[in-house]
Structures are given as structure tokens and as C-alpha cells.
Design a protein with these regions (language model features):
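Zinc-dependent deaminase catalytic domain
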Residues: 1-166
Length: 166
């Protein structure tokens, strides 16, 4: 089971080993850096037994043009965040991580998903059906139905604090 909390190393302090949560969330933020979305940079990591099974970030399907190259229809139509997901050409980070595990035949049942933001309702349903047991996040998302579904399915959602600056 991952430990809670994180380690922040400030100038002049001895280097400390980060908790598992801090370690995995830091990797999740690095994964988010690969995102090609013009609106949000989201990363996801699927973990089981302290091992990384799959990663994902939000972006266009493999082989297709990226939003950063062709523009964002949601931006052009001024669609608010959290609405009209079907207009987006990208997959969400959570979806990409789940698909990567499936593509390579990796079971993610009883796994933990680390994500830079709370899953939307579409991703929540995929997390539930994939049999994941826990979601660990640092940012909320305006989707109360997603939170309600995860709760109803018995999927634990834990919030981590963002590391503070020194």
C-alpha cells in the first residue's frame, strides 16, 4: 500500500527519500509533460505492488495529428472544461494508460491509478470496469458524477497535497 505524504527537498536540507506516493506522483507529472493538449496537461500511471504497469497522457490517437498541430475544436467553439467530451480529438490520460495495459496484455485489476487530476465520468467508468481499487490525485475536476460513481463502486479516491515551494 502506498505511503501518504511527500518529501520536499529545500536548498541546504539533506536529500530525503520520497514516499511511494510522492515518487509515483512525480513520475505522473513527468508523463503529463508528453501531453499534446492545448488546454490541459494530464498524466496517469497505473501501479500494482509498487510496480509501474502503464502510463498515459492526454493526446490524439496514435498516428493522428496532435491538437497542438491542428488546433483545438473545443477552444474554437468555446466549450467549457468538463463538457462535450465527444468533441475532443484526444484520449484522456487515464484512457491511454488503460489502453496501453490492454494492448500489452497487462492485468490492471486491483491496481492503483495515479493521476494529476480527478478522472471525468467517462474515465471513472473505465476505471471501475477495469477493476482498479484506488485513484490517487492532486487536483479536483468539476465532475460530481465521476466522484459519485467511483464511491458507489467502492473505488477509494485519495488526494495528495502538491509539494510546497521552498
Amino acid at each position: 500500500m502506498p505511503e501518504t505524504g511527500s518529501t520536499v527537498r529545500c536548498k541546504g536540507e539533506k536529500s530525503m527519500r520520497p514516499s511511494w506516493d510522492a515518487y509515483f506522483m512525480e513520475i505522473t507529472h513527468v508523463v503529463a509533460g508528453r501531453s499534446t493538449c492545448l488546454r490541459r496537461k494530464v498524466g496517469a500511471l497505473i501501479i500494482k505492488d509498487k510496480r509501474i504497469l502503464a502510463t498515459g497522457y492526454n493526446g490524439a490517437p496514435s498516428g493522428l495529428a496532435h491538437c497542438q498541430d491542428v488546433g483545438c475544436i473545443r477552444e474554437q467553439q468555446q466549450v467549457p472544461s468538463g463538457e462535450r467530451h465527444e468533441l475532443c480529438r484526444a484520449l484522456h490520460a487515464e484512457q491511454n494508460a488503460i489502453l496501453q495495459a490492454a494492448l500489452y496484455g497487462v492485468s490492471i485489476q486491483h491496481a492503483t491509478l495515479y493521476c494529476t487530476t480527478h478522472p471525468c465520468v467517462m474515465c471513472a467508468k473505465m476505471i471501475i470496469n477495469a477493476g482498479m481499487k484506488e485513484v490517487v490525485i492532486v487536483k479536483t475536476y468539476p465532475d460530481t458524477m465521476a466522484a459519485a460513481l467511483l464511491d458507489e463502486a467502492g473505488v477509494t479516491v485519495r488526494y495528495l497535497e502538491e509539494p510546497s515551494a521552498c
